[in-house]
Regions:
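A nucleotide- and high-energy phosphate-metabolite-utilizing enzyme signature
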Residues: 2-317
Length: 317
């Protein structure tokens, strides 16, 4: 993917000012999507809403967010219909579109619909993308998995904010799965549930308290990931074998499952997950550094990945 960095400004904390926090990860968009990137910048959802009109704030947020989504989706689908092989590069564009909607809705809900006069530390919340959304690989109609991370037990304010955000996102037609947990709960579940642990392996802060999200990651690596590599490898390989049996343990099927079948996207992801878990790599190119792949191997890996994403995106639209 290209080097163009373009992530919409993100609010650093629910309860603080609107300063941009440079620590938040950025999404890279390929130059093929430069015109759409410009559209992202121009269409600031919050600027299109009368924030003083409290009685219509929820409805107006929904209307303007739907307009934004419809416009961007139309542009992206036109581009993919014209050139299906741009599909791998579109994953970041779809991710960014969802990021902007979630950030905008979250800021409006937390700051204008449920303003706090005297916020406490207990009201800090981080909205964290996990799973495929966390690694910024979003096909046109992929599910969005979110972790609403709280420092302690959830407050009444937090319940209202999270519930309102979710209902607006659902009304937007987004397929959002979610969990609401504090750090200790997240660690406990990660230790006991391999699926939850895998999804947390690739988490990404979307909105909210940066320090809270950083604390989660530090403790995940210290208390969970670094102590359980052999178990993780065994579980993921066992999971792969069961998946292959279910889908038909053959490479060449008349109607293969692009995601779950043998040699499909999930197999490529499993290889990367294991490598990330063991070596704490943050980029697939690091697979060469740790001698998991040769340069030629990595090129084959990327070609296979691009091909499978091209098919999957084509099936989505």
């Amino acid at each position: 993917m290209g080097n163009l960095k373009c992530l919409n400004k993100q609010k650093a904390n629910f309860n603080k000012d609107n300063k941009v926090n440079s620590e938040l990860k950025k999404i890279s968009l390929n130059k093929s999507f430069q015109t759409i990137t410009t559209l992202f910048k121009k269409q600031n959802i919050i600027s299109m809403i009368d924030l003083k009109n409290k009685s219509e704030l929820r409805n107006n947020t929904l209307i303007k967010s739907k307009e934004f989504k419809k416009n961007i989706v139309q542009k992206l689908e036109q581009k993919l219909n014209k050139d299906p092989y741009l599909a791998p590069d579109s994953l970041s564009a779809y991710t960014l579109m969802n990021d902007i909607m979630i950030q905008s809705v979250s800021e409006i809900v937390s700051k204008y619909m449920f303003p706090l006069v005297s916020p406490t530390k207990g009201e800090n919340i981080s909205i964290v993308a996990v799973g495929g959304y966390g690694r910024a690989e979003m096909a046109p109609y992929s599910d969005i998995d979110l972790l609403f991370l709280t420092p302690y037990k959830q407050t009444a304010w937090g319940e209202n904010v999270i519930e309102t955000i979710l209902y607006i996102l659902w009304d937007l037609g987004l397929k959002v799965g979610h969990s609401v947990r504090n750090i200790n709960e997240s660690l406990r579940i990660a230790k006991n549930d391999i699926t939850a642990r895998t999804s947390l392996l690739e988490n990404r802060l979307i909105f909210g308290d940066v320090e809270l999200a950083n604390q989660l990651n530090k403790r995940l690596w210290k208390e969970v990931f670094s102590k359980s590599a052999p178990e993780f490898i065994e579980k993921k390989l066992e999971e792969r074998n069961l998946r292959h049996q279910k889908q038909g343990a053959e490479r060449y099927l008349l109607e293969p499952n692009i995601k779950e079948g043998k040699g499909g996207l999930r197999d490529l992801q499993t290889l990367y997950w294991i490598s990330k878990y063991v070596y704490k790599i943050s980029n697939k190119k690091d697979l060469i550094k740790y001698k998991i792949f040769t340069k030629d191997d990595l090129e084959i890996f990327f070609k296979a990945e691009d091909f499978l994403w091209t098919i999957r995106c084509a099936l989505h639209i």
